[in-house]
Amino acid sequence: MRPAHYQEKWELLKDTEDREAINSLAQRIASSFIDRYFYSDEYNSDYIHLLCEMATHYSDTERNQITSRALFGIVIERLCNDFEELQTETYNRLICQVVDFLRNLPGGKELDNELNDFQLETAEKLYQRIESIRLCPDERLPAKLQPRKVLILSRVTIGADVAITSVICQRVSRTFPHAIITVVGNPKLEQVLSKESGIRIHALQYSRLGGLLERFMVWLDLLKEIRIELKGLSTSEYLILDPDSRLTQLGVLPLVPDTNYRFFNSRGKEDYPSKASITELTNMWLDNVLGHDEFCFPKV
């Protein structure tokens, strides 16, 4: 069905308490977007706009979460789990559209202000930023960068933190033995990274069950925590590594100037081998960024 049909259905449901009806409509809209995208190569922004509207319409979180789950579960996760380059580009475009919707809500004022401070006033500018990062070759760190502190963003899921984050921690600690290395993420990371490693954990929760606005507002919390960690450091004294973290919506949302930030596109790049394991890709990315070859296995 076309978006106009679903818009009519939504107009009839706006004041309903019928959660099953909301869920049914949200799932049909999300599935229609996916079907048209994969089978007709059509990115129809009207479907996404309607899902955003439904996911932020109600005053109670529970009804908003219904559509948020459909948007993430049916659309966003599907794009994330498909390691084709085109789906990565589409994910970036979609997230930029969602951010643009949210920043214009009454509750999105702080989100809008922070993005404006990064000179990212529009969805297109946000999109161009992440696409330039995605498409450019991995950039080696400049020699003048001698970080006293390295912040590594968690991948949020334990399995990915073992396979990717633990490798990054080992490589970085060997390259910068005198730096304070901190992983930002769930406190449960203490169960993954041994105390003997000397890696600090800066606790920050990301709820995968939250509403649409709440999922993106975690970026504001992350910004505040990053600024606390970096207080008093010059631009040559810190580094942030983002291994495709959900905390930044897979790199779409910025944290610091690009000179102090490196993003690992774990979903693959044109110059990455197509059949390499995620651990091999992580080491390959670190070879490029750190400027020397080494290989570390996941470690807990």
Would you name each region that the model predicts?
Residues 1-300:
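Catalytic machinery of carbohydrate-active enzymes
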